[in-house]
Amino acid sequence: MSDTAERIKKIVVEHLGVEPDKVVENASFLDDLGADSLDIIELVMAFEEEFGVEIPDDSVEKIGTVKDAVSYIDEHKA
């Protein structure tokens, strides 16, 4: 798992209170990890702070899985 993926996993575990082994690449934040819309907003804010990236609202809709988040951040981080 990449450094980005490990850091995202840590954030997801902390914010959603899920077991680390549930946070796998293809896990859906909504369906598999039990996040609701408020959780998604909080996760995005945490990702932005952790990685120094801005994630616009139209991009948030495209980040549905852990893998989506890793890909987006890897493409946009400084």
Curated annotation (Swiss-Prot):
Cystine bridges: none
Keyword DNA repair: no
One record GO biological process: lipid A biosynthetic process
Gene3D superfamilies membership: ACP-like
Annotated ranges, domain Carrier: 2-77
Gene Ontology MF annotations: acyl binding; acyl carrier activity
PTM text: 4'-phosphopantetheine is transferred from CoA to a specific serine of apo-ACP by AcpS. This modification is essential for activity because fatty acids are bound in thioester linkage to the sulfhydryl of the prosthetic group.
Broad class of where this protein is predominantly found: cytoplasm
Family recorded in the similarity comment: Belongs to the acyl carrier protein (ACP) family.
Protein name: Acyl carrier protein
